[in-house]
Amino acid sequence: MVVTASPDTYLHVIDYGLKKVRLRFDRLLLQAFMAGVYIGMAGNACISLAGGFSTDPADPKAITAGVQKFIYASIFPVAFIAIIMTGAELFTGNTMTMLICWFERRITIWQLLQNWAGSFLGNWLGTMFSAYFLTYLCCPFDHDPYLSYLNYTAASKVSYGWGSCFLRGVGCNTWVCLAVWFVVACDDAAGKILALWFPIVAFVLSSYEHIIANLYTLQLCAMLGVDTSLADMIAFNLLPTLLGNLFGGCGLIGMVYFYNFYPVVGHGDDAAEGSICGSSEKEECPSLVGVPRGASVNSLAVSAIPSVFSAPRGQRESFAGESSTLVMGDIKRQRSMASTRKLGGGADKKDVQLTVRQFDETEMQSTMEDMFGLEDPRNAPKGNPGTNPPSKSPESSATGGTGAAASPTATS
């Protein structure tokens, strides 16, 4: 598992958000719908196992409430693993990524609100579908111990109070956005899964409130006819949880790390009118990150480092495998080059891209000789560094330069 540095991870979070902006609204809804389905399916698995145990002390087969909660918490991260690996859209994670992109002036406020609204609507429809078709119609949760477990769950969720539920939402989305940050920082699938599992388990064990998970659970409780009314679920749980999740993702994670890294790796005063990411999938979208993660040395033979403001989006890999091999010095040099150019808006502006050769020593020699017909200058004989090469005489110039003065290997 390779973990990138925090400034580099911050740049990948921006790229991650820009990819979400480029989604058509129908695709955004579909991917958000699937994220809601995954949340519901994981919730179904959690209820099937954790809800099947009794916590009554009089029952000899009973388990403690803490063990029951840990069983639930250990299964629930499967939903987030499915969301990350399939590229589905989860509202709670988007609160951090889209806010950072907006603060970086890479998207407009309309694009931010459109993404939030689309992802929340799709998540809600997905949880409703999962609660009705994948749980209510097929899974027998209408009897004990499952019905008692869901009845207790709904009653406890509306009994926290507005302030407590809001703060539980703040803590929950802080963990969720940290999980997204950890996933971006990791290089391989196994590392992403391992890094994702612990934050999700932590928020479930802490009894924090997640708006999308609560949408599935409380809709299922309403379908089963628990004692808690739907109005109380909305007023005393769903609404404060939604606001708390927004504050946790935007305030504790998005604003904090934007403030922490913006003077170092952000655009700052170099931002131009043309740096806003377009909403069309066919338009170019600026990328702050360079060489894709996970590619071998041979595949990066003639890779291009995108400039700060212009790089084709199609050249980048998927989020599951992207990263940057650039260090902070490379990023600063790119910003310095970009600031010396005369910047202007418009989609027809073309940027100069630098080719990077990442050959090892043997590949460099063979490639220069076979592909370009050139000799490796490192193998050429070197002259005395203390002497200057003789000047070229008119006779040697006229005869084609056969003397030592015309030798291309002479060095000063």
Swiss-Prot record:
Extracellular domain ranges by topology: 54-69, 138-164, 214-237
Family annotation (InterPro entries): Aquaporin-like, For/NO2_transpt, For/NO2_transpt_CS
Residues bearing carbohydrate: 151
Annotated region (Disordered), positions in chain: 330-349, 367-412
Function of the molecule: Monocarboxylate-proton symporter; active in acidic-to-neutral pH range. Transports L-lactate and formate. Probably acts as a primary L-lactate transporter in extracellular tachyzoites.
Family assignment from sequence similarity: Belongs to the FNT transporter (TC 1.A.16) family.
The protein's name in its UniProt record: Formate-nitrite transporter 1
Annotated source species: Toxoplasma gondii (strain ATCC 50611 / Me49)
